[in-house]
Amino acid sequence: MADSLVLLTGATGFIGFRILVELLRQGYSVRAVIRSAAKGQWLESRLTAVMKGSDYKDRFQTTIVADFVTDGAFDQAAENTSYIIHVASPIVSSDNPDDWEHDFKRVAVKGSIGVLEAAKRSGTVRRVVITSSMVGLFSPKALFAEPSEVPLNAESRIPEMEPPYAHKMLAYQAGKIASINSAEAWIKHEKPAFDLIHMHPSFVTGRDDLATTREDLRKFSSNWHSMQIVLGHKNPIGKPILTCHNDDVARCHVSALDPKVAGNQSFLISCSPEDGSEWDNVKKIVQREFPEAVAQGVLPNDGHMPTVNKGVRFDVRKTEETFGFKHIPYEAQVLDVVKQYLELPEKDEGVEISTTA
């Protein structure tokens, strides 16, 4: 492990940064892909704050790849690496549906195939791990509408979705589906010396060590699914309560580098919702654990988001048995995020609210 260099994309994001920290703590050397020198400086500052003097600096480096879809974009970055973990997703700012086929789908496929081609050209890469999503495996109907006759598992594959897309989430899903299908087809056709593993997390929740203020945590991420309720927002659009802790996501990605884990397979990452689970149950948890913050109005705790398809079920036994852990339950996920929110200052303020948990 000590001489194993991992190329990591997406290190400046919520999931990727947690994977970066876990890699360094496990003794790996990491070359993080960044899009600009400024991003690299910011990443190093956050890493210094989180690692708190740990002996890691001689095992961490950055490399700039400004455009992920350029031919050969990752070739130089992948040189002399043993593993690649590709977490980065397309950055999409357009609200024009005419742009989404390119921005979500084609860019996602180009990025994944570009990573695989760079791994092949390197001659040193032994395994590539790609971060996908649960939406890359299952249809919208299976996730949002139909109770599971049998628990859904990571062996599922579905045909690609074609435009037009009714909303951004469908375009995002189309990109994830196309990416995994294209990557697996590439592996089958090229038969490279390395293998491929896909990770499929559900809605990722947990402490975000890139956040330095409460305002950061109020910006949209998958943590927002729960925090919007805690902070008093009322969202009419429902979602299934399928979540996983960021620590578990990082654990699975890093553990997947172990050669004892067979390659060319997928893993579903999600805790199992208990019967009767609803997003709005977060209000009971917060009232019980943080009564002072609720009384002060720091946590309004009166929001709402509908829970849809309470009958959906996942089979994550393969994930837990392969990597030797049990998924962190939803309540612990929520507590980690709310505790962090209360610990952090508001923007440009230094006031912290005491907690009871």
From Swiss-Prot:
CDD domains: AR_SDR_e
EC number, as in UniProt: 1.-.-.-
Keyword NADP among UniProt keywords: yes
Leader peptide range in chain numbering: none
Source superkingdom: Eukaryota
Record note on disruption phenotype: Abolishes the production of cercosporin but accumulates the naphthoquinones called cercoquinone A and cercoquinone B. Leads to dark orange-red mycelia with significant export of colored compounds into the agar.
Stored Gene3D superfamilies: NAD(P)-binding Rossmann-like Domain (3.40.50.720)
Pfam families, A to Z: Epimerase
Record GO terms (molecular function): oxidoreductase activity, acting on the CH-OH group of donors, NAD or NADP as acceptor
Binding-site positions, NADP(+): Y172
Pathway as given in its UniProt record: Mycotoxin biosynthesis
Induction text: Expression is positively regulated by the cercosporin cluster-specific transcription factor CTB8. Expression is also affected by nitrogen and carbon sources and pH, and is also controlled by another transcription activator, CRG1, previously shown to regulate cercosporin production and resistance.
UniProt keyword Cytoplasm present: no
Keywords in alphabetical order: NADP, Oxidoreductase
Top enzyme class: oxidoreductase
InterPro entries (UniProt xref): Epimerase_deHydtase, NAD(P)-bd_dom_sf, NAD(P)_dehydrat-like
Family according to the record: Belongs to the NAD(P)-dependent epimerase/dehydratase family. Dihydroflavonol-4-reductase subfamily.
Entry-linked PANTHER family: NAD DEPENDENT EPIMERASE/DEHYDRATASE, STEROL-4-ALPHA-CARBOXYLATE 3-DEHYDROGENASE, DECARBOXYLATING
Protein function: Ketoreductase; part of the gene cluster that mediates the biosynthesis of cercosporin, a light-activated, non-host-selective toxin. The perylenequinone chromophore of cercosporin absorbs light energy to attain an electronically-activated triplet state and produces active oxygen species such as the hydroxyl radical, superoxide, hydrogen peroxide or singlet oxygen upon reaction with oxygen molecules. These reactive oxygen species cause damage to various cellular components including lipids, proteins and nucleic acids.
Protein name per its UniProtKB record: Ketoreductase CTB6
Native species: Cercospora nicotianae (Barn spot disease fungus)
